[in-house]
């Protein structure tokens, strides 16, 4: 179940919890948004940033025990 977080400090606290298993970073070049998604036991927490400097600092401050994956944009399926 998804849940959006607006505060960076609260997001870092969630990342440090024991039930946080993996993090994904999704970059959208068209809207200049960077989404951080953290999978916990009950919720998938999402933080949306528009500042790339803050995003790099947040990526560096994520705990090393968390599995971090950069997600590339998927190609659209072609119809026959």
Swiss-Prot record:
Keyword hit for Ribonucleoprotein: yes
Claim: Glycoprotein is one of the keywords in the record: no
Entry keyword set: Cytoplasm, Ribonucleoprotein, Ribosomal protein
GO biological-process terms attached to the record: protein-RNA complex assembly; translation
Cleaved signal peptide residues: none
UniProt xrefs under InterPro entries: Ribosomal_eL38 (IPR002675), Ribosomal_eL38_sf (IPR038464)
Coarse class of the protein's main subcellular location: cytoplasm
Tree of life domain: Eukaryota
Pfam families associated with the record: Ribosomal_L38e (PF01781)
Compartment(s): Cytoplasm
Gene Ontology MF term list: structural constituent of ribosome
Any GO CC annotation of this UniProt entry: cytosolic large ribosomal subunit
Subunit structure: Component of the large ribosomal subunit (LSU). Mature N.crassa ribosomes consist of a small (40S) and a large (60S) subunit. The 40S small subunit contains 1 molecule of ribosomal RNA (18S rRNA) and at least 32 different proteins. The large 60S subunit contains 3 rRNA molecules (26S, 5.8S and 5S rRNA) and at least 42 different proteins.
Similarity section: Belongs to the eukaryotic ribosomal protein eL38 family.
Function comment: Component of the ribosome, a large ribonucleoprotein complex responsible for the synthesis of proteins in the cell. The small ribosomal subunit (SSU) binds messenger RNAs (mRNAs) and translates the encoded message by selecting cognate aminoacyl-transfer RNA (tRNA) molecules. The large subunit (LSU) contains the ribosomal catalytic site termed the peptidyl transferase center (PTC), which catalyzes the formation of peptide bonds, thereby polymerizing the amino acids delivered by tRNAs into a polypeptide chain.
Protein name: Large ribosomal subunit protein eL38
Organism in which the protein naturally occurs: Neurospora crassa (strain ATCC 24698 / 74-OR23-1A / CBS 708.71 / DSM 1257 / FGSC 987)
């Amino acid at each position: 179940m998804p849940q959006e977080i607006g505060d960076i400090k609260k997001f870092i606290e969630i990342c440090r919890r024991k039930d946080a298993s993996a993090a994904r970073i999704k970059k959208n070049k068209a809207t200049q948004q960077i989404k951080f998604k953290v999978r916990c036991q009950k919720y998938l927490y999402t933080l949306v940033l528009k500042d790339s400097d803050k995003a790099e600092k947040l990526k560096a401050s994520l705990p090393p025990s968390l599995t971090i994956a950069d997600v590339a944009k998927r190609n659209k399926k072609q119809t026959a």
